[in-house]
Amino acid sequence: MIDLWPAIDLINSTSVRLTEGKYDTKEKMEKSVEDSIRFYSQFKCVKRIHIVDLIGAKAKEVKEFDYIRSLRKVTTKPIEVGGGIRSKQTIENYIHSGIDYCIVGTKGIQDIEWLTHMTHQFPNKLYLSVDAFGEKIKINGWKEDAKLNLFDYVAKIEHLPLGGVIYTDISKDGKLSGPNFDLTGRLALYTSLPVIASGGIRHQEDLFRLESLNVHAAIVGKAAHLDEFWEGLS
């Protein structure tokens, strides 16, 4: 089974889900953040918890640091955090607080020199989040066009000691309509970096198909809140 990384998206320390990254589609989840983490942590196939500070992503600076730090005591699973991470100090703060991995997006996409320095200071601790409509990369909470092609950009960071590349097809996100198998599979073939699929994953069949495409792990958002998604998993 492909590694599962259940996603928890935070707004004001509350678990929510968005559709296509649009903040006006915010839907509050029934379970609390803590209860969700405890539920996910009982499964061996869950290899880490993926947490995103949505307001931080929008504001271009971390907003939920203290709350996210408090979640470290809820689980023994590794935790990765993204949203508004744009400085060495922020990365250090998270790592020193017990967070295992940090996700960088906009800053790393806009400033490859900075990304290079950070990956060498924190080797294999950073994941690059590349969010795109198809091959067109978006930045700043998915609101702006980076004017970069997915494959052209990944070629430039291929040599860096990143933990991997998280690819989200925004058009699929939060819709439970299936991931973009074509582009995700092409990306997994294109780069030697581990590729993590995100956006649109519905059920276990999607996971098996992603695994067949040599995708390293799957970030599961909305589907992870459905009991039937977990049936038969251990």
Curated annotation (Swiss-Prot):
This protein's pathway: Amino-acid biosynthesis; L-histidine biosynthesis; L-histidine from 5-phospho-alpha-D-ribose 1-diphosphate: step 4/9
Subcellular location: Cytoplasm
EC number: 5.3.1.16
Gene Ontology biological process terms in this record: L-histidine biosynthetic process; L-tryptophan biosynthetic process
MF annotations from Gene Ontology: 1-(5-phosphoribosyl)-5-[(5-phosphoribosylamino)methylideneamino]imidazole-4-carboxamide isomerase activity
HAMAP family in UniProt: HisA (MF_01014)
Family as reported in the entry's similarity comment: Belongs to the HisA/HisF family.
Name of the protein in its database record: 1-(5-phosphoribosyl)-5-[(5-phosphoribosylamino)methylideneamino] imidazole-4-carboxamide isomerase
Organism for this UniProt entry: Staphylococcus epidermidis (strain ATCC 12228 / FDA PCI 1200)
Organismal lineage: Bacteria, Bacillati, Bacillota, Bacilli, Bacillales
